[in-house]
Amino acid sequence: MSSRIGGHMAATGRNCYRSAMCTVVILRRPGHNWPILIGANRDEMAGRSWERPGRHWPERENVVAGIDLLAGGTWMGLNDEGVVACILNRRDSLGPDPDLRSRGEIVLEALDHADADDAAQALSGLDGRSYRSFNLIVADNRDAFWLSSRGRVDEG
């Protein structure tokens, strides 16, 4: 399920409960010199091995992101076309599940697209049951989308 995030607004991961959660705040200002400002905190499993943002994937030379050394994906990144994507876990879905795919793959799949609209359309058909539950933000200088592995997402 996906929803377009409205114009001049800040959006946050709304499912921040009492357990450790990643947080992202996005300020979209279409037409501004800095159309997207992002603040993020990755606090799920702080001891999990990772490397700082870089071009870690030879098959995705246009992607800059931190890399999760356990599963090989990322929690947040951007591509040379200006698409940014980040994943947020949901309540009761902390950590990996050996029977499911890594949510970090979804961010990389979003960054395979030249704009946020194409990414959101491509990912809207994902089978959420293949992953632990998540919220995904995909944005560029024109659009921003919130995709969820569960149910309907209200527009921001």
PLM regions and their residue ranges:
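N-terminal amphipathic/basic-hydrophobic helices that include classical n-h-c signal peptides
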Residues: 1-20
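N-terminal nucleophile
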Residues: 16-156
